[in-house]
């Protein structure tokens, strides 16, 4: 009888070990999506959404791995890895090398421009009014700041790369937006391209929020979607299937929707809500 019990116990333990699951998440130092230190540590949008998924999956261990932001796609594309990342842009090329969820993991406003409030007033650009980036850089001759090697969508990328005789200031990607925000506050550049939550977080953390404002662009789509991506192998396929189902669950919660709004300025939150509601 004891032998039977011990055999059963051994089988149970081995089964538990074989069924133990871990999802390895790639995180990177890119506020306000991941905030690794300072006053707002661990209050990043993407890291908080991962925590919501973690609560939904108590039987799966979530392991966070910190890597440079420029290496995320490279690590995901390596089939010898078993890793996932949140809020990725999905295109045909990436889908050849990475599994993506059908459900979006994040929804946000598309790229906008930040500028001095005094400049917005001088140009008579009302709050929340969409402006044309082409008009600002070609007709108004404003100096535009951008981060090097970063995509802002096909239309904006093409506009920047193909418009002749524009005044462009480019900074390397690491901490480039913070550097450009500092330049914007000093009026060394006129306008700065980025995502609304990034503009808001940097202005707030650098104590420039009283000086700076932002406007949506006519060249940007209404919304920007991010998806979970996992390594394109057997384990990645299983992880994607599980995470896709859990996204359906958390996206119905108030906690999730609050996270989408966390790093948006108050005046842009109704705009995001209305645009999300219009897609339902």
Regions found by a protein language model. Give the residues of each.
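Acidic, polar ligand-binding/catalytic clefts
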Residues: 64-138, 216-220
């Amino acid at each position: 009888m004891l032998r039977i019990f011990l055999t059963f116990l051994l089988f149970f333990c081995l089964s538990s070990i074989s069924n133990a699951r871990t999802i390895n998440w790639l995180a990177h130092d890119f506020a306000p999506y991941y905030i690794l230190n300072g006053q707002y540590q661990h209050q990043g949008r993407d890291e908080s959404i991962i925590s919501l998924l973690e609560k939904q999956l108590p039987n799966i261990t979530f392991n966070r791995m910190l890597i440079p932001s420029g290496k995320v796609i490279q690590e995901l594309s390596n089939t010898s890895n078993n890793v996932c990342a949140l809020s990725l842009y999905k295109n045909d090329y990436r889908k050849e090398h990475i599994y993506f969820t059908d459900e979006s993991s994040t929804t946000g406003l598309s790229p906008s421009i930040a500028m001095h409030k005094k400049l917005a007033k001088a140009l008579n650009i009302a709050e929340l009014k969409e402006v044309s980036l082409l008009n600002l850089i070609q007709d108004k001759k404003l100096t535009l700041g951008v981060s090097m090697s970063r995509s802002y969508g096909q239309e904006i990328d093409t506009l920047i790369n193909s418009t002749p005789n524009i005044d462009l200031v480019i900074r390397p990607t690491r901490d480039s937006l913070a550097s450009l925000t500092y330049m914007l506050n000093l009026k060394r550049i006129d306008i700065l391209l980025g995502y609304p939550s990034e503009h808001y977080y940097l202005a707030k953390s650098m104590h420039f929020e009283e000086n700076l404002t932002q406007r949506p662009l006519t060249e940007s789509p209404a919304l920007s979607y991010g998806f979970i991506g996992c390594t394109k192998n057997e384990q990645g396929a299983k992880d994607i299937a599980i995470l896709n189902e859990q996204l359906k669950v958390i996206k119905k919660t108030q906690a999730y929707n609050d996270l989408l709004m966390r790093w948006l300025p108050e005046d842009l939150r109704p705009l995001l809500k209305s645009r999300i509601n219009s897609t339902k």
